[in-house]
Amino acid sequence: MGLSVGIYGGSGYVGVELVRLLAGHPEVGSLAVASRGHAGRRIGEVYPQVAVGGEYLDPSEVDVSSLDVAFVAYGHGESAEAVRGLLEGGVRLVVDLSADFRLPDVRVYEEWYGEHPAPELLGEAHYGLPEVFGALEGRLVANPGCYPTAAILALAPVVRRMGGEVRSVTINALSGVSGAGAKPSARTHFVSVNESVSPYGVSGGEPRHRHTPEIEIMLRRLGEAPPVTFVPHLLPISRGELETITVEAGELPGAEEVLGWYREDYGGWRFVEAREEVPHISHVANTNRARLSAAVDRRAGKLLLFAAVDNLLKGAAGEAVQNMNLALGYPEDLGLEHLR
């Protein structure tokens, strides 16, 4: 029979990647794809590049009681309401791709996002970066944000080993326009992004991107870590993400030592690789890989970490399927082998 899987928010950029991946997954028997904006339209009509049959359903048309697994790709706030209904409806596993369950402290969530619709579920959520925090043992996965995925993979081995020696962390991140979502806006219009690069998430003279507390909280689970300065930039490309992370610390390790830490921590995982060559976005676009590297500027006394991911795959849909695989006891790369 195979798994009965539902996708809520299946017409956004992340949602359609989920459709593409799960339609070809060997353990998925049936797929219900919900979209309020496109209910009744054929999936291939909305996204001709996706060779998947069937129509988008209105969320109310999905038989929740029949689902084994549900993926929720709504925005924050709306997502939590859907997750609550799915868990109450008996769905075996829910993978939420919004920010609603990434921050375990409701006070921190409300500072950055507003009132939380389902705070009683925060304690049930497992932060789904398996290479760092392992696989889920429960029913709810909080899929990480794209920027935190790259940042935490790069920083986790350093924080584990250097802890209180780290004095400051500055993350300079660049992402393709798909990271801003499918809904058009003046900021993501072709004329606005073409032949330009612009920082965002800076408000009132202060960097205030919502991924900042997510990165800080997860690093502090691993060891002593300072506040993080995080500034993302929009690139005039469709997909992909590159981060250059500057770490100030007391005694700096060598670049080869850091690469050794990466290989030690991630050697048993399929989708994280460390190389001496600095990563390019083109190295990881359209894959579920994260590529890491390191360098040391001894003249300035700084450690430089580099991380590249595809924001729609390892930064979202690919990681979500990886989390499903691990939670259900399948190999982590099942259905993702072509994305290694």
Curated annotation (Swiss-Prot):
What top-level branch of life does the organism fall under?
Answer: Bacteria
Please give the SUPFAM superfamilies that the UniProt record associates with this protein. Answer: Glyceraldehyde-3-phosphate dehydrogenase-like, C-terminal domain, NAD(P)-binding Rossmann-fold domains
EC number(s)?
1.2.1.38
Main subcellular location: cytoplasm
Query: Where is this protein found?
Result: Cytoplasm
- The signal peptide, as residue positions, is none
Q: Which GO terms describe its biological process?
A: L-arginine biosynthetic process
Catalytic activity field: N-acetyl-L-glutamate 5-semialdehyde + phosphate + NADP(+) = N-acetyl-L-glutamyl 5-phosphate + NADPH + H(+)
Q: Does the keyword Metal-binding apply?
A: no
Q: Name one GO molecular function term.
A: NADP+ binding
| Pathway annotation from the record | Amino-acid biosynthesis; L-arginine biosynthesis; N(2)-acetyl-L-ornithine from L-glutamate: step 3/4
> What's a GO cellular component annotated to this UniProt protein?
cytoplasm
Q: Where is the active site?
A: C146
Q: Output this protein's name.
A: N-acetyl-gamma-glutamyl-phosphate reductase
* Gene (UniProt): argC
